[in-house]
UniProtKB/Swiss-Prot annotation:
It catalyses: a plastoquinone + NADH + (n+1) H(+)(in) = a plastoquinol + NAD(+) + n H(+)(out); a plastoquinone + NADPH + (n+1) H(+)(in) = a plastoquinol + NADP(+) + n H(+)(out). Transmembrane segments: none annotated. It is a peripheral membrane protein. Belongs to the complex I 30 kDa subunit family. NDH-1 shuttles electrons from an unknown electron donor, via FMN and iron-sulfur (Fe-S) centers, to quinones in the respiratory and/or the photosynthetic chain. The immediate electron acceptor for the enzyme in this species is believed to be plastoquinone. Couples the redox reaction to proton translocation, and thus conserves the redox energy in a proton gradient. Cyanobacterial NDH-1 also plays a role in inorganic carbon-concentration. Its main location: membrane. It holds the Pfam family Complex1_30kDa. The keyword NADP applies. This is NAD(P)H-quinone oxidoreductase subunit J.
Length: 176
């Protein structure tokens, strides 16, 4: 029987880790490849303290549009996640395929829930970050207007967390 346990070629390693993940690593930005989603979009994870640097670098690679920023809760006792979906937009005549990347930051709900705001890189992250703060309690450091977007300012808790307990009563205020 033949032993097929030879070391993987560098091309196979690149396919496993992802092209963008490998490039970020070569540029000194620690990240973890999470594979590709069902349509082939590469997904990677970075630590909160590396997010701003990673997104700045990705913008330099040509991912010049923040299509979506959001958050989700993996479940009670598990991580809260802030995610970023970036795409590369160029001249509409030259686009053969849209290049996409998704970046995730996993936050332990029992520790610091802060990530850097991307407002200085992508102005469109303003309301998206505010909504994520409002629904999940993830703080965006250096955000220009870190206030609630959908819920009243005096609302307690984060309604889209899976461990959220809905209040029995909340007094509605008249609009006039």
């Amino acid at each position: 029987m033949e032993n097929n346990s030879s070391p993987e070629s560098s091309e196979e390693i690149v396919k496993q880790n992802g092209i963008v993940s490998n490039q970020l690593s070569q540029d000194g930005i620690t990240n973890e490849s999470l594979g590709n989603d069902h349509i082939g979009v590469e997904i990677l994870s970075v630590k909160p303290e590396k997010l701003y640097e990673a997104i700045s670098t990705l913008r330099g690679y040509g991912f010049n549009y923040l299509q979506c920023q959001g958050g989700y809760d993996e479940g009670p006792g598990k991580c809260l996640v802030s995610f970023y979906h970036l795409i590369s937009l160029g001249d509409i005549q030259d686009i053969k395929e849209i290049k996409e990347i998704r970046v995730k930051v996993f936050l332990n709900r029992d520790s610091d829930l802060s990530v850097p705001s991307l407002y200085k890189i992508f102005k469109g992250s303003d309301w998206q970050e505010r909504e994520t703060y409002d629904m999940f309690g993830i703080n965006f450091a250096d955000h220009p207007n870190p206030t609630r977007l959908l819920m009243p300012e005096d609302w307690r808790g984060w309604p889209l967390r899976k461990d959220y307990i809905q209040p029995d009563f909340y007094e509605l205020q008249d609009a006039y």
